[in-house]
């Protein structure tokens, strides 16, 4: 039976005030007006479809035409109650009729428990309830598939869903707020599985903005800014890696990390191409881990990823989230751990992103003296707000769980810890005790670290922290921040200052190479020669070395051997493993051509490959990195000869003697104290001809005799090549 006659009812039109809010986009509960509503003896169906020329309700085999009341609101009164199911057939000018389930007849997709946990800041899988999620519901007329959307905007006057599906029209899909939670929600049937969308937010300040989804899993390729509905059907192949990860403690294991900016390692490669080429290269070079500069979506490529706008979306520049999963999977199957840089300290002010999201300071602190980072022109998160803290903690867990990431290197921790960080006098507000410590940030970092290690055992968290803050790597249960490791910025600065000097003057600065051992075991350290040291006019590691090309190459080889021998884990930025001569720029690729044009670059690359192989095979270089038992000086005081020497010890009883000649001339007949007599094998000589060195050395080893020296029971006489490193082990 077909019915198209107009039916009327006393409840056909909503109250004028409600209608006005609906049209203005500021109604907090459009579901209370739209959809099907039962009265005493009839049911009213209302649909808000501006620009539609006809709307028909399909109830079984019956058709009921909705009357256009005003401003795009259509309604019809059905002469019965207990309506089980219906569809809407909507026709626009010049278009064929389109039949769809009514979005305003579905219950909320978030439960009370989810909202309660979020309000308390304790929802550990928050990304599963906020954002965009494809869903299906079984109704009397069949299965209805679509996408549920949920966004936190507690001070907004109204929120609407806009996208390709409705021509970016801000009227057709108003969302409802779920009680006092501040979460706005809507399920939209038949939403495209990879459709673009945003939220049109009527801010508390009267400004209407179109916002990207803070929890979006996918985005448009920058400079476009819309969010994209994204789901995963990826099948992982790294079960063995993940099972082993849960049993490991990275602090006591080998860890040499290759730091990579994906866009400029070899420009033009996708995630899946990188899964082959980058993985093969890292395996060939022998690194145990790769650290990726931020992969979360960021609009400005020149920020290198450190100004994030979509914290839950891998950048779409190189492919889809599943493509990124394939990259991580390939690295894991090759035995390579994956660390990503994570940026919870601050976020950019783009008007379509997180800043003043609902017309008020929401994600950022409301006090400008705490809520803005002046140096970078960015906002600072309000770490004391439970929902914001939950957003960030859940984000850390998201990368660890959804993408199998093995570690987070937390950027700019010092800026989080201190309220007066890079602020002028009078430009900051003290904490409740009158101090400069950001107590809320401390609590956030402790919560993040404790939760991450609980949820994903075996992962590593690393702090980029350059101040004397005590206990960065101390467990949270004894008052520490709970990081696994922190960057040793002091070691980096002192070492680079020293090796940059002409050898003639190094003896006057010998303390720069010994000072780090006064605090080497106060924290668990990473020794970083990172991207920060090859930008902004600093040149490159190669460029810092004094002398001609032969001397520069020798200097860089000895520096790298010193880094690998010093207590702490290693991190080296891409390009430095072959001595790139040009300063790095994200706008172009590495100078791979150097490997075809000169032997020095090939020699440095070969050295890095070999020291990684030696490093992994010698627990003395890593198993006791964080305790004094893993290290002792042989001679820290030979400044006259620019020589340093020390022993490394492994938890398995192994030993390694390391000698560094930072003078520009060789030293013959150099006596070195050793712990035992007998044959000592030269496992590394950075001056070997295979590294394009001069070939000066000890013919593969030396014989130690029972002649005490340097306070040790035995000694050997060595030849120390100029600007070189020697590593020796008992034969």
From Swiss-Prot:
It is an enzyme of class 2 (transferase). GO terms for biological process: capsule polysaccharide biosynthetic process; glycogen biosynthetic process. It comes from Mycobacterium tuberculosis (strain CDC 1551 / Oshkosh). GO terms for molecular function: 1,4-alpha-glucan branching enzyme activity; cation binding; hydrolase activity, hydrolyzing O-glycosyl compounds. Monomer. Essential enzyme that catalyzes the formation of the alpha-1,6-glucosidic linkages in glucan chains by scission of a 1,4-alpha-linked oligosaccharide from growing alpha-1,4-glucan chains and the subsequent attachment of the oligosaccharide to the alpha-1,6 position. Is involved in the biosynthesis of both glycogen and capsular alpha-D-glucan. This is 1,4-alpha-glucan branching enzyme GlgB. Pathway: Glycan biosynthesis; glycogen biosynthesis; Capsule biogenesis; capsule polysaccharide biosynthesis. The active site is at 411 (nucleophile), 464 (proton donor).
């Amino acid at each position: 039976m077909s019915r198209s006659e107009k039916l009327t009812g006393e409840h056909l039109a909503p109250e004028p005030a409600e209608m006005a809010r609906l049209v203005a986009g500021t109604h907090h509960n459009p579901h209370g007006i739209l959809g099907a509503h039962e009265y005493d003896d009839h049911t009213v169906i209302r649909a808000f479809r501006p620009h539609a020329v006809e709307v028909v309700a399909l109830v079984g085999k019956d058709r009921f035409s909705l009357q256009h009341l005003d401003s795009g609101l259509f309604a019809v009164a059905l002469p019965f109650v207990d309506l089980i199911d219906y569809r809407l057939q909507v026709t626009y000018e010049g278009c064929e009729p389109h039949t769809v389930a009514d979005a305003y007849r579905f219950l909320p997709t978030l439960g009370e428990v989810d909202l309660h946990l979020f309000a308390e800041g304790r929802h550990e899988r928050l990304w599963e309830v906020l954002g965009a999620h494809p869903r299906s519901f079984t109704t009397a007329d069949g299965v209805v598939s679509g996408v549920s959307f949920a966004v936190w905007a507690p001070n907004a006057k109204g929120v609407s869903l806009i996208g390709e599906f409705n021509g970016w029209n801000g009227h057709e899909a108003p969302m409802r707020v779920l009680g006092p939670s501040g979460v706005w929600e809507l399920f939209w049937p038949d939403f495209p599985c990879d459709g673009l969308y945003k939220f049109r937010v009527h801010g508390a300040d009267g400004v209407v903005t179109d916002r990207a989804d803070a929890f979006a899993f996918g985005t448009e390729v920058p400079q476009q800014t819309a969010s994209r509905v994204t789901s995963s059907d990826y099948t992982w192949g790294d079960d063995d890696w993940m099972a082993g990860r849960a049993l490991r403690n990275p602090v006591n294991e080998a860890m040499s990390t290759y730091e990579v900016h994906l866009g400029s390692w070899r420009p033009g490669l996708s995630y899946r191409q990188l899964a082959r080429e980058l993985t093969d290269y890292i395996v060939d070079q022998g690194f145990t881990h790769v650290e990726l500069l931020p992969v979360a979506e960021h609009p400005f490529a020149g920020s290198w990823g450190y100004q994030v706008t979509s914290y839950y979306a891998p950048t779409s520049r190189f492919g889809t989230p599943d493509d990124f999963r394939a990259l991580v999977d390939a690295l894991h199957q090759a035995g390579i751990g994956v660390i990503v840089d994570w940026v919870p300290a601050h976020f950019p002010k783009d008007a379509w992103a997180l800043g003043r999201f609902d017309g008020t300071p929401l994600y950022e602190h409301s006090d400008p003296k705490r809520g803005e980072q002046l140096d970078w022109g960015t906002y600072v998160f309000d770490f004391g707000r439970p929902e914001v803290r939950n957003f960030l903690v859940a984000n850390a867990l998201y990368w660890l769980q959804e993408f199998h990431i093995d570690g987070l290197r937390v950027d700019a921790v010092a800026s989080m810890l201190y309220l007066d960080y890079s602020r002028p006098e009078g430009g900051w507000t003290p904490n409740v005790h009158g101090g400069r410590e950001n107590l809320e940030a401390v609590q956030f970092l402790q919560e993040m670290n404790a939760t991450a290690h609980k949820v994903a055992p075996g992962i590593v968290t690393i702090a980029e922290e350059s101040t004397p803050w005590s206990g960065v790597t101390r467990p949270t249960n004894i008052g520490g921040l709970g990081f696994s490791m922190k960057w040793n910025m002091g070691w980096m600065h002192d070492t680079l200052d020293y090796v940059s000097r002409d050898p003639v003057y190094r003896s006057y600065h010998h303390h720069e190479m010994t000072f780090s051992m006064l605090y080497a075991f106060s924290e668990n350290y990473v020794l970083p020669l990172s991207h920060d040291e090859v930008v902004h006019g600093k040149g490159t590691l190669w460029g810092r070395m004094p002398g001609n090309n032969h001397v520069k190459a020798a200097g860089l080889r000895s520096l790298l051997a010193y880094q690998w021998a010093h207590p702490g884990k290693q991190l080296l930025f891409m390009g430095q493993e072959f001595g790139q001569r040009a300063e790095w720029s994200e706008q172009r690729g590495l100078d791979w051509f150097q490997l075809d044009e000169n032997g020095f670059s090939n020699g440095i690359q070969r050295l890095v490959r070999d020291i990684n192989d030696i490093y992994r095979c010698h627990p003395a270089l890593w198993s006791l990195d964080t305790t004094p038992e893993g290290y002792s000086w042989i001679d820290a005081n030979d400044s006259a000869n620019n020589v340093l020497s020390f022993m490394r010890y492994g938890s398995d009883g192994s030993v390694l003697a390391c000698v560094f000649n930072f003078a520009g001339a060789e030293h013959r007949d150099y006596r070195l104290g050793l712990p035992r007599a007998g044959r000592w094998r030269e496992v590394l000589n950075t001056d070997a001809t295979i590294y394009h060195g001069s070939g000066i050395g000890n013919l593969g080893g030396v014989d130690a005799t029972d002649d005490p020296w340097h306070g040790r029971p035995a000694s050997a006489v060595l030849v120390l090549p100029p600007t070189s490193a020697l590593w020796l082990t008992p034969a």
